[in-house]
């Protein structure tokens, strides 16, 4: 377990991730995608109901999350991490960094990559690789309006809540749907699955797999 969230460091996270045994999933006829699980600073807060705002810049560690643009054909308005399909010849790391630059205007080099978490196969036909990235303060983010409705800095302590995760059975699913509460709302898998595994294995030192958790029905297409 990392002794204090406030004491998170690049070296410490890189070491913890180096000891993580990643479970990869063969894509078969599915499309490869990657997301950036980007660690940044809380800044002025998450800009969400039920979460505090800070008049002065807060350097406590946070995750960088987005809400997808309402104009998108798939998964409009859903919580997400910067990410998308791999271009021909790209690695998941390259794709995650490219998508972060395109979606939120944050350009980082390969040295910011700390490691990977487990792949997750979605019902919509993707195998997603989460790439953990150290984003620094990331003070000048700009949402690409064609892809991102809003950008949020969610303090890591929010994901340590006692009521997380939320597990529910739904008809037609063999395994529970996993959600993570945030403020007065919640985030669904696959994004919630990546957050939960990062919390359990990397922050708390509890080996946890998440690929079996299902998504809510609205995310099946």
Describe each region flagged by the PLM.
Residues 1-80, 85-102, 106-139, 148, ...:
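N-terminal leader/linker segments that precede catalytic domains of diphosphate-processing enzymes
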Residues 143-181:
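NUDIX/MutT-family hydrolases
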